[in-house]
């Protein structure tokens, strides 16, 4: 039992900075929305539309680069730190390649925006220009993620948190300058948020690069001239590990976007109640997501040490801690759901619906915690293909169709509206949790030689 308490402390020490880093990242989006809204409602809407396209694209690249964390953790655990710099260097190459792809997609996203039903031409043009300003930050964001994943793979999660808050602090004044046109800069309105955010991502990258170069604990991780060359087998291996995670993230983000579109014809009250509940549950999701990142680091490190039993301990402890946190957040949600809804809106109908949906959110928080931490465990084992198949089946084969049937048809019961989609979320996330646990148990029952051979690839 003692080893589980020790492991829990290690996991929390890694997870807590990740929680704050995620809060800082989320706050940047909130700041953009609020400051654009202060300029005009049209500019705020343009930022919202642009962000809805930016997020799936950039999270695809983000997920691809998550392959670095278990690779570096495994090398660190096995004492092969001399090989880490080469992996990081090839990570930069992969980030550069995917950046070009993302920038091309975002540059041509105007076709999607202008094709939206009944969209105002002025709003559409602002959204397009916002994206075309923001896309220049894609390389900076992904290069920052390479260095952040390097640090996290070495069990150093504090730098990512620090850079997140530096980015947030820089974002506010730079937004102000470009939105309202101060210090000789043009007045760009909502488009200025795109310019500011792109600039901030580059600032975060250069600050992280400066920290890594100065960190005493990383002085032995310096790229040799030979490691600066393209190593296509390494790049291909990183892509093979990261691609399923990238697609899983993409499917998750697009799922919620599709549900929002399906709910939108139901009326203002239904849309507002759904959005409030979704926003709050996303905030609660930060806790298990951070624990997932910590578990990936610990499992990868233990496998690098050649200890499959200790890797199992890390995995089990992560799941247990995640369930405990989910129980606490679920109780908090149940008890305070009405006051929380009132913070967003004072319309009685909206508050009633949002509080009802938050009750459903409380039900799935435990299964959501298990599935996302299970995903982190599988990343640590470098078994990422199963993550893709599990999330695709759970979200798109089970969750969305069942939500559509319950929410918008009378095939099973009378149409339930947004609540039907939330029952779909419960089914999808619970199915994902069960499949993640089954896959984890399957991997852990394999011979140690097989597990370690997979981890060393």
From Swiss-Prot:
NCBIfam families: matE (TIGR00797). Multidrug efflux pump that functions probably as a Na(+)/drug antiporter. Signal peptide: none annotated. It comes from Cronobacter sakazakii (strain ATCC BAA-894). The keyword Glycoprotein does not apply. GO terms for molecular function: antiporter activity; xenobiotic transmembrane transporter activity. It is a multi-pass membrane protein. Belongs to the multi antimicrobial extrusion (MATE) (TC 2.A.66.1) family. MdtK subfamily. The chain crosses the membrane at residues 11-31, 53-73, 93-113, 127-147, 160-180, 188-208, 243-263, 276-296, 316-336, 357-377, 387-407, 418-438. This is Multidrug resistance protein MdtK.
